[in-house]
Amino acid sequence: MTNIRKTHPLMKIINDTFIDLPTPSNISSWWNFGSLLGLCLIMQILTGLFLAMHYTPDTSTAFSSVAHICRDVNYGWFIRYLHANGASMFFICLYAHIGRSLYYGSYMFQETWNIGVLLLLTVMATAFVGYVLPWGQMSFWGATVITNLLSAIPYIGTTLVEWIWGGFSVDKATLTRFFAFHFILPFIITTLVAVHLLFLHETGSNNPMGIPSNMDMIPFHPYYTIKDILGALLLILALLTLTLFTPDLLGDPDNYTPANPLSTPAHIKPEWYFLFAYAILRSIPNKLGGVLALLLSILILIFIPMLQTSKQRSMMFRPFSQLLFWTLIADLLTLTWIGGQPVEHPYIIVGQLASILYFLLILVLMPTVSLIENKLLKW
């Protein structure tokens, strides 16, 4: 008799995705981040749902409703900090996942990669509108500054900003619609994740060597289910440590002050996971130029497959490309640091140099070095 998991229409989908899926035998722990992102998404949706039961998206009560969740709701403080720090964990996993794809050439699965870039943009949008909801000082001014960037668009800019605000400033209408966006976007993300997996399972996973994976495949269960459970336990351990010992480590103290349109914080800055893009934005004195650089810093990922000049897919056997890859990581960390600093000397020039290096590495240096490495293959 055939097993039910191989015949039942629903069970068959689960079986082909998580149980009998042929998987390369040599994928490393860098391939764990996909499942960790799935775990983060489920966790964020669940904690977010419980927070939404007590939150009120109204300018007069939003801040107090968050205080009420932390003080009066059973384990409300825990749910709130799990949700806030869960977002940080989400982005750590997301950046590790993208970094792994860049290093091992997984971007050559173009459909999977493009859906992934779309996912990144959607997650960033969700995190941005979510940060506005507690209605603290940084929520209000962050929303004002970032939405204001759209006014740099010629001709329609100002109208567009006022349309997004639902008025002439960030106010009640803005908060209400941002809550609506923050509620709906995770479900759009979930749908995109399904499409992402659909495209991935058309080709199968890449592997560290960058050679065809068909040579040596093993079933996903039990080999990679147990490996993913270990990754999940480590992620949960890290998240709980952060949430229970230093819940405000990654937050901004200004957000414990209720939003006040008449008082501007000394340093307006987004959450840490947007600081690298924020630093690139600030490095260009021209408003429109800054906005374009900000967009390009993320959208440049779409062009990565077109910039592949190497005959080898993975960087595993390409020491010069490896050097440039880790230089890029160091550059992104530098930009993240600069994004959190005030706009003054020497941070301005360091930020500008790091921004130039970021685009130079991706668009010029890495493709050029790959061509040189192709020549070295003949030695």
Swiss-Prot record:
CDD domains: cytochrome_b_C (cd00290), Cytochrome_b_N (cd00284). Binds 2 heme b groups non-covalently. The lineage of its organism: Eukaryota, Metazoa, Chordata, Craniata, Vertebrata. Heme b b562 binds at H83, H182. Signal peptide: none annotated. Heme b b566 binds at H97, H196. It is found in: Mitochondrion inner membrane. One of its GO terms (molecular function) is ubiquinol-cytochrome-c reductase activity. This is Cytochrome b. It is a multi-pass membrane protein. The keyword Glycoprotein does not apply. A ubiquinone binds at H201. Coiled coil: none annotated. GO terms for biological process: mitochondrial electron transport, ubiquinol to cytochrome c. Heme 1 (or BL or b562) is low-potential and absorbs at about 562 nm, and heme 2 (or BH or b566) is high-potential and absorbs at about 566 nm. The cytochrome bc1 complex contains 11 subunits: 3 respiratory subunits (MT-CYB, CYC1 and UQCRFS1), 2 core proteins (UQCRC1 and UQCRC2) and 6 low-molecular weight proteins (UQCRH/QCR6, UQCRB/QCR7, UQCRQ/QCR8, UQCR10/QCR9, UQCR11/QCR10 and a cleavage product of UQCRFS1). This cytochrome bc1 complex then forms a dimer. Its main location: mitochondrion. The chain crosses the membrane at residues 33-53, 77-98, 113-133, 178-198, 226-246, 288-308, 320-340, 347-367.
